[in-house]
């Protein structure tokens, strides 16, 4: 909800009715506040300013970020592929500033946790304990993660403080300033999580599967554009490579198995990711 203060400042009111978890609501507000305080003072890049929290009522107030979220901007006002790539570079630069603003740690990548996680999911699907749409294709994705992980173990990666929900709806663009909103976590994790949540969100909405190379989730020009702005790691970072496939599976698991149980948005998401999966989950070589 939009309002205006006595001083003329535009305000954004947020009220969360469900789930009722005041401690979690406060925690998310605190993470956003910490991100705002740490973010560098830069021309053209910002984090929305938190102003007020009522923990028990689950109400918060932020300074309003002018503009459109990138999902809407690219859908309605930036339809050409060339202009979208410029926006992707800008988004990459915002995330680069965000990740560098606080703790960064270099690590040797061990994909064992990710592989074990998805192997457990595969076991639940095969034993009937978990239902997903198009399970055969989903399981090819698990096999692809196993294949990729074997080639990525031992490579260097970077962990940093995550955004937590870095999709296209959480960057606001007014033509001059790109502003991050809805920051929800404060823990260290590999950079590939934030990077792929954003890029897979873009690819599924705006790129046909024909643009992909076999075995890949992200088209080459998308990688080049984003990583022209995001320079903390290269597109060859092991978590960027592995978690692109994992992000497809994470989206997939949120979609009900039965079509009649899906919202229109969930059905659309499935229609978007299946063609990508058919190309991306093909074995390399």
What are the roles of these predicted feature ranges?
Residues 23-38:
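The N-lobe alphaC helix and its flanking beta3-alphaC-beta4 segment of protein kinase-like domains
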Residues 47-58:
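Short beta-strand micro-motifs within the conserved protein kinase catalytic domain, predominantly
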Residues 60-69:
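Short pocket-lining segment of the protein kinase catalytic domain that shapes the ATP-binding cleft
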Residues 101-164:
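An alpha-helical support segment within catalytic cores of ATP-dependent transferases
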Residues 193-234, 245-264:
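Active-site activation/catalytic loop segments of kinase-like enzymes and analogous catalytic loops
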Residues 68-111:
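Conserved kinase catalytic-core helix
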Residues 2-27:
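ATP-binding glycine-rich loop module of kinase domains
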Residues 169-197:
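Catalytic activation segment of kinase domains across protein kinase-like and atypical kinase folds
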């Amino acid at each position: 909800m939009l309002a205006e203060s006595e001083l003329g400042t535009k305000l954004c009111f947020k009220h969360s009715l469900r789930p009722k978890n005041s401690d979690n609501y406060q925690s998310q507000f605190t993470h956003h506040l910490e991100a705002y305080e740490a973010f560098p003072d830069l021309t053209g890049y910002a984090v929305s300013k938190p102003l007020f929290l009522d923990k028990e009522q689950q109400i918060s107030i932020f300074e309003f970020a002018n503009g459109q979220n990138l999902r809407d901007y690219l859908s309605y006002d930036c339809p050409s592929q060339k202009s979208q790539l410029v926006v992707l570079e800008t988004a990459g630069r915002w995330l680069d500033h965000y990740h560098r603003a606080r703790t960064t740690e270099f690590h040797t990548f061990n994909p064992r946790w990710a592989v074990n996680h998805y192997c457990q999911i595969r076991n639940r699907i095969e034993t009937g304990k978990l239902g997903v749409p198009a399970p055969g294709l989903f399981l090819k994705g698990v096999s692809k993660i196993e294949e990729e992980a074997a080639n990525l173990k031992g490579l260097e990666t970077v962990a940093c403080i995550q955004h937590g929900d870095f999709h296209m709806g959480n960057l606001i663009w007014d033509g001059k300033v790109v502003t991050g909103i809805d920051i929800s976590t404060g823990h260290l994790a590999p950079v590939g999580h934030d990077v792929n949540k954003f890029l897979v969100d873009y690819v599924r909405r705006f790129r046909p599967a024909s643009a992909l190379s076999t075995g890949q989730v992200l088209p080459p020009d998308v990688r080049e554009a984003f990583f022209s702005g995001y320079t903390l790691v290269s597109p060859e970072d092991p978590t960027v490579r592995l978690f692109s496939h994992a992000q497809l599976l994470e989206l997939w698991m949120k979609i009900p198995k039965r079509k009649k149980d899906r919202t229109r948005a969930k059905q659309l998401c499935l229609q978007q990711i299946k063609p990508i999966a058919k190309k991306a989950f093909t074995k390399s070589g």
